Amino acid sequence: MKVKVFILTWQDANALNNNLKTLFDGFQCLDRVKDVHIEVNIINNHTNFSIDPRYVPHVKVIHNVAQPDFATAMLARMWNLAIIHGFKSLAEPDCDIVLTSQDDTVWEKDWIQRLVSIRNNYDFYADDAGDMVCMHTPNSVRKIGLWDERFHYGFGEGDYFLRAIKYMPKESSINDYAHGRVWNSYIRLAKRPEPDDSRYTEQNRAHRFRGLSWANFLYKWGSEDLEGKWPDDVQKRVLTIEPVPSTILYPYFELDVEDLKGKGYIL
């Protein structure tokens, strides 16, 4: 099984290096699983980038030089870049799993063994708070599609999770206990550290535009109570909601997504 990990930076070298430390600590358990090969990638969005020299030979860094330092978070686009860089093609994927992570993730010591167990049971998996850690497979992307880049900051993970339980309910495990979005709960891969006030000074800039993403969520799903803690009838409700028009952004990749027209894509 070939796994590609993609860590997204957020101008926080301390958090990133702690992520890498706990990630690579888990490699000590590689001998407990068979035929698992792991490649670690970092998608860096800022010029003030630095990692511990110990990890430099073991990671591939993709520098997003087109994004200026004064820009705010664009998580949906970054997750899509990870999926596309990772699989390269849905028809002939280059790996079995794309595992995405925010930079302040703290991995469980046996996260590799847990990942194998998760993959044996599910095709899409989300852990902890929102999109902190997500496991994608070629099958999950074919059925759910890519992330909606109309969500620039906030609510994009809520949209993706609703699409997961709409298009692939049995093969999805969502463990977003922080927001009350839980579906087919399973074991945990990681956890988020205690909040660091200095980190959120930068994040507050992005919060100014959060209302735009909220408007997009309401446009797509039409109800406030589908965001945050899910109602008991969440799956029944999402099945009755017609998809809004969407645009294909990456035709060389997205045309292998199943039933694009049924998902509302303009063809």
Which residues fall in each region the model found?
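Short, well-formed alpha-helical segments that are part of the catalytic scaffolds
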Residues: 12-28
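Cell-envelope/extracellular polymer assembly enzymes that use nucleotide-activated donors
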Residues: 2-4, 39, 159
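Acidic donor-binding segment of Leloir-type glycosyltransferases
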Residues: 23-67
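Aromatic-glycine-rich donor-binding/catalytic loop that engages nucleotide-sugar donors
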Residues: 138-154, 163-169, 173
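Conserved donor-nucleotide/metal-binding helix-loop-beta segment in metal-dependent transferases, i.e.
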Residues: 109-128
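Active-site-proximal specificity loops/subdomain of glycosyltransferases
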Residues: 48-95
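C-terminal catalytic/acceptor-binding lobe
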Residues: 19, 158-267
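Short beta-strand-to-loop acidic/aromatic patch adjacent to the donor-nucleotide binding site
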Residues: 92-106
